Amino acid sequence: MTGDDSIFGELWRNTLDKILALFREQQRKNGTKTSYKFQRKTHVLHDTYSNYGYGHPSKSCGMIASAFRPSDDSQIFPYLIPANFFAESVLRKAAVILEKVNKDAGKAKECLALAHEIHKGLMENATVVHPKYGRVYAFEVDGFGSYLLMDDANAPSLLALPYLCPELVSVNDEVYQNTRRMIWSEDNPYFFTGTYEGTKIGAIGSPHTGLDKVWPMSIIMKGLTSNDVNEQRECVDLLVKTDAGTGFMHESFNPSNPADFTRSWFAWTNGLFGELVIKAYGK
């Protein structure tokens, strides 16, 4: 940590203003139709957005609506729960910077007010009672009561919540642990399994790569959100075993044939893998 706060100057302030304006608009307090819509001709369903580009109808609840997941796939419901937790966390951190570095209590208050609205929306809409796992976090909701139970490997994800915003969701939180058990099982429609060299492999995938591939990022996040060093090291060992001899982490791979992978070198996952190695062995 350098303690260098010189980056929080005019560019930072202007950028934050634009982000706040966008967040406010996408709370959709005046209805589903905002200035943003996205529609294009494509042979891939998740590359465009329904309802002439406006997406599934939403009911204003304080959360921020979005059209696409971190995977770049279009959402089914407009309120992506992991992204809203992350937004709340970042807004609270931005408020600290504004107050301590920029000496702007007014803008800090604005960030905190928006964070509070998101938090209220999450508390009222983010959880449902699963018949097998108890109370869990939904992946997406619409504010009307509809919800989607799944997780995608890309972060922000439900699995990654304690990694991205530990001040909001603890690893030991009961709802998170219930959710973790659900999404790291075949009760998550995007959890896939296979067997490679006698080892059964199961991990979370993504609609982005179809129905037969798991993502190293999900295995990494499993390790990064674990307090068990043995589990962390098991994740490292599995990732090393399934790199297809390339020495790199990939976007996704077939759990029964790691040589069948996408992206020969995926910087995002390679960086996270290094962090997991430090967490598992650096101590």
What are these model-derived regions, one by one?
Residues 6, 31, 130, 231-232, ...:
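Secondary-structure boundary/capping signal
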Residues 148-170, 174, 210-283:
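C-terminal capping/lid segments that line or modulate ligand- or cofactor-binding pockets
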